[in-house]
């Protein structure tokens, strides 16, 4: 059984010509949503994926608008509302050294170089120059915000699901 990656969520239809409004969850929109690419729609409350081929893609405000081959009207795509767009995990692109997919980082435990267990990564924010990993503290209290920079993140061990950090002054306060 194959594993799947979510690459977007269909939040609504757009117009009457079969376009769907997608909230993207991929960093590779130009590749994932290009004409001819196959995506799979996991409709709400369904256990089966529907294979669709992208006919066109364009940006509109903060959304991606997609049309699928063989779905020329709003009536054809109405059932996709609320569905997730997915691709098989084998379709993910290769990443460079020190680059990770969000799903690989979320859930990893975070420890200091001194061995103190801090918590688990629950979310990743992308505010600008670098990602920020949100760590849910083991001891309760406020979440920690860990910048993904060389000075702080010393090691990421995906096999052990563990991230080792060297906290900067004030980071753990």
From Swiss-Prot:
Pfam families linked to this entry: PRC, RimM
Coiled-coil portions: none
CC annotations in GO: cytoplasm; ribosome
Gene Ontology BP term (one): rRNA processing
InterPro entries assigned: PRC-brl_dom (IPR027275), PRC_barrel-like_sf (IPR011033), RimM (IPR011961), RimM_N (IPR002676), RimM_N_sf (IPR036976), Transl_B-barrel_sf (IPR009000)
Subcellular location: Cytoplasm
Ranges where the PRC barrel domain occurs: 97-171
Family that this chain belongs to: Belongs to the RimM family.
HAMAP family the record matches: Ribosome_mat_RimM
Name the record gives this protein: Ribosome maturation factor RimM
Species of the source: Halalkalibacterium halodurans (strain ATCC BAA-125 / DSM 18197 / FERM 7344 / JCM 9153 / C-125) (Bacillus halodurans)
Gene name for this UniProt entry: rimM
